[in-house]
Amino acid sequence: MHAKSLTELRAALAAKECSAVELAQLYLKRIEAARDLNAFVHVDADLTLAQAKAADAELARGAGGALTGLPIAHKDVFVTRGWHSTAGSKMLANYESPFDATVVARLQAAGMVTLGKTNMDEFAMGSSNENSAFGAVKNPWDTNAVPGGSSGGSSAAVAARLAPAATGTDTGGSIRQPASFAGVTGIKPTYGRVSRYGMIAFASSLDQGGPMAQSASDCALLLNAMAGFDERDSTSLEREDEDFTRHLGQPWAAGNDAGKPLAGLRIGLPNEYFGDGLADDVRATIDAALKQYEALGATLVPVSLPKTELSIPVYYVIAPAEASSNLSRFDGVRFGHRAAQYGDLLDMYKKSRAEGFGPEVKRRILVGAYVLSHGYYDAYYLQAQKIRRIIANDFQEAFKSCDVIMGPASPTVAWDLGSKGDDPVQMYLADIYTLSVSLAGLPGMSVPCGFGAGANAKRPVGLQIIGNYFNEARMLQVADAFQRATDWHKQVPAGV
């Protein structure tokens, strides 16, 4: 039962093959048995089972919806009433929110059962989930490897089938890269599509929540509940509600032959995504996935995103600048860590922040404060914003000749735990293919498409699919067609 997708579990509940309480108990036992993965940081069986009982009561009355009774885990960046909400930081180690994030509230209103809070890089700053105050997360496929970050706890939980689905956030690739490393499906919606209210902020102009699950169809179900305008979030976009499942299983164009369901689909391949730095085994796996798309009727079209290499310096100016402002609120006064020994108030601020924040967070706060300081704002921050606009324009130019863009989600498979901790630049380079999508505010997703080679044969590879603004339903259709023709998304780590 634990290996079933959300769609399959939904059918099992409808057929009364199991109850919501039985499902919750099953996953809680699995979470306890897999504590060595360190995927979860907060679990409360009483809260979970109370939600499951309420879901069973709804189902018994025939009042349940598409997600009623289905379990989900939440990245610990979403504040959740009744649970600790820490953002992976010592600074918020004992914080309990008096309210639910909009994402959490909407999924609970849809009847979903919260299994717990998943581990993450501190304040979502990291690409490996080694920056957490609660310790590193292990990749279920190879426990010597990282699960990706910053949503590494969520990706590991779904991969190990400790939860059928999880929420994540993506600022520069933090849903797509861990989804790739852990062999699960994850989607970052268009910026503003999903409310950021109650999501502990890293970089406000980039942060976006999204679902992680086994399949594109599962992600579509979740996005139906998560997306929508929220007046409490000033960056939330007013759009008519839509059904993200509406194109699943449908041909790209009416009248397509059943054997060529994607005939007419134009897939853009950026030259810059297939150059130096892309590992040979990842390239071979992506090439095989693209051949599968050709077999389904799609046409491959060369495109160019010439400013791709600038996305790293641009991101690491803009994101730290916004982080330095957002994290200024954590000073040990109202909540969070407070130093035990200090002199005056200013000394308390300094010591509380020095003790409460980890090394990577401190690094980014310092960088952000520097680029925003007098004399450097124009040279760095303003210039980065101008290049950000050029990057977005490059995508729009590319979309004139294609419907979606594809390439690797990461230049390599997951690396060994501890292997890049002393070299932050090498860690940052791992996000080269995801950063520009975030800077442009576009939707993007990662779909499992195979594994590495040799010593990396147990480490998954993800295919990144990028769509134009508000084109999530079509992206999910394209991903779903691939998953109907392959079984990479159904494969599980040994022992699972």
UniProtKB/Swiss-Prot annotation:
One matching Pfam family: Amidase
Gene3D superfamilies: Amidase signature (AS) domain (3.90.1300.10)
EC numbers for this chain: 6.3.5.7
Active-site annotation: K75 (charge relay system), S150 (charge relay system), S174 (acyl-ester intermediate)
Superkingdom as given in the UniProt entry: Bacteria
InterPro entries, alphabetized: Amidase, Amidase_CS, Amidase_dom, AS_sf, GatA
Keyword Signal: no
Keywords, alphabetical: ATP-binding, Ligase, Nucleotide-binding, Protein biosynthesis
GO molecular function: ATP binding; glutaminyl-tRNA synthase (glutamine-hydrolyzing) activity
Coiled coil region boundaries: none
Catalytic activity: L-glutamyl-tRNA(Gln) + L-glutamine + ATP + H2O = L-glutaminyl-tRNA(Gln) + L-glutamate + ADP + phosphate + H(+)
Record's GO cellular component terms: glutamyl-tRNA(Gln) amidotransferase complex
GO biological process: translation
SUPFAM superfamilies tied to this protein: Amidase signature (AS) enzymes (SSF75304)
Family under the similarity heading: Belongs to the amidase family. GatA subfamily.
Known partners and oligomeric status: Heterotrimer of A, B and C subunits.
Role: Allows the formation of correctly charged Gln-tRNA(Gln) through the transamidation of misacylated Glu-tRNA(Gln) in organisms which lack glutaminyl-tRNA synthetase. The reaction takes place in the presence of glutamine and ATP through an activated gamma-phospho-Glu-tRNA(Gln).
Name of this chain's protein: Glutamyl-tRNA(Gln) amidotransferase subunit A
